[in-house]
Amino acid sequence: MKVLSTEYRVPGTEYRLPSSEFRVPSSARTVLRALSVLLLTVLPASLAVSTALAQDSVIVIDPDAPVSDSTEHGALPPEILSELLEDYNDSLSIRLPGGITVPRGSMLGGKIAAFRGSVHVAGTIEGSLTVINGDLVVDSGGVIHGDVLVAGGGMTVAPGGVQEGEARVYWDAAPVYREADGTLALRERRRSVGELATAQRTFATGKVKTTLRLTTGQTYNRIEGLAIVFGPAFEYRPSHNIFTRLDARGILRTAGNSSPFRDDFGYSVRGDIRFNAPRGFGIGGRVYSEIRGIEEHTLPKDEIGWSAFLLQRDNRDYFDAQGIVGSLYFFPSRRLRIEANVRHEWEGSVRATDPWSLLRNSEIWRPNPLIDDGHYNSAGIGIEYDTRNSQNATTRGWWIRGGVERGTSDDVAPVTLPTAVRDPIPTHSYEYTRLTLDLRRYNRLSADDRLNLRLWAGGWLGGDPLPVQRRLSLGGLDLVPGYEFRAETCAPAGYADPADAALCDRAIFTQAEFRHRLPIRFGYTYHDKNNRELDRFLGIDEVYLVLLGDAGKSWLTGDGPGRVPNNRIPSLDEWKADLGVGADAGWVGVYLAKAVTDGEPVRFFIRLERRF
């Protein structure tokens, strides 16, 4: 096969494969776009119906059933983790290996615990049963006289099976591992790449807990290079219902800088006081001088950093922000947070510097675009609703974030943009309003299958046109990875901008991925000849096959050629869409994506975190 073009990319960017002449017929493009959007609403409902119809013949305790059922919800609570460890590690417990069957006619008695693998009960168990990271199946004729606790799996009682006593089922896997003596212990949470270079020490003096921290800014970019963050944090609890915190951080920017537009040192000092935790309300305030990213809903900071450090590809733009913000937030429930804030800050342009990169170090970094400099006053309200069972390894739940911001300025110094993008904005009495919404749904279909869905929308809502630092684009491996970085910027034809700035008023995109756990393990298993319970595995023990689809559009809003009316979104036949496949091992994922609405090449990319 003749290679037409190749581009080497790293984590956080993409590898371009040989160009392809394949194009999806235009008659099919609208259908593919519609399916991408329809998938967000139709598929979850159809799956729920099919699941219900398939369960007529057996009793299944479903952890996602309504609250009225005998079902536990939410993340695996700490008290349940403690109970699991206590049950399994009890010297009086009978420990069963995973994948065992209690045969018909046999009987086990006492306190019984099993780790990893399904437990089938066709005989009789007299006593309590704990199953950790496995399923429990009570076959026809099987009887359990006692309480049951299942974590990391489901429980099925076939017709003719009996379970007497309390039954508690959590589909969330227990983060535990087997130690050399056969007991279980809690596994430390896997740290993200950005947290690896972190050192901290925590100690307490009376009611005050102090944490000293030295870390990076969890990124590397063409403005700061590697930012070193350091400073103390103090926590004080004068009573059970009052929590206070003061966090002071200095920021040292290591990239050389001869520009007067950026200091080598920044800071952030934040204070919070919260009442009636975890429910109740709180008051917070922060003063800061920091480099802030534009379009921060795209790639995480650590993946941006690795791409910049390794291949001199910084897929984000930045500006200098110095100011003060005050906030008032409420927790009507453990899952819901509502916040109102007011802010006064200086926002200024910054130039790209020339930090070192491992590869392509002799090349020139992409320029950082100019922004609309000025002092801005803003007021905003934000809502976050989070029912995820885990923040680090989510398998089910909702995560919804949204906000409205109204900003004003009396001394803005605007960048001159083509009139096709925006008319000149006023330098006095300038005001705008913008909206953002990020809606995510995680579904656990079975022990091995997941379906994750996302809808993001944002942009101009009212007032004058948005400032450059609030504008949007589409394209790149975090949004629609079948397309190159900033495939849509809303720049008019013939407009040359080496910074490739995002200029769109609004953007919307949808993402869907189906994840299936593969029976693949990479690594080494240490076998204990005398006790199977002491077997240990080192390596990658979980790999997911990922099928993905994305669709989205960014545009200019208003009246006139090339614009979409304010009360409408673009028709689906104008959206860009892609399909892809990949493998995710948790700490790294490799993917292939192909645009289905344009003749783009197949793109290969690597992610260091889940897509969303």
Language-model region placement:
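Outer-membrane beta-barrel "beta-signal"
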Residues: 380-383, 580-581, 585-588, 601-612
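Outer-membrane beta-barrel initiation region
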Residues: 72-91, 97-99, 103-104, 152, ...
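Transmembrane beta-strands of outer-membrane beta-barrel proteins
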Residues: 245-251, 284-288, 339-343, 401-405, ...
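Extracellular beta-strand scaffolds
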Residues: 99-101, 107-108, 118-121, 125-127, ...
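C-terminal outer-membrane beta-barrel translocator/porin domains of Gram-negative envelope proteins
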Residues: 258-260, 282-327, 360-539, 549, ...
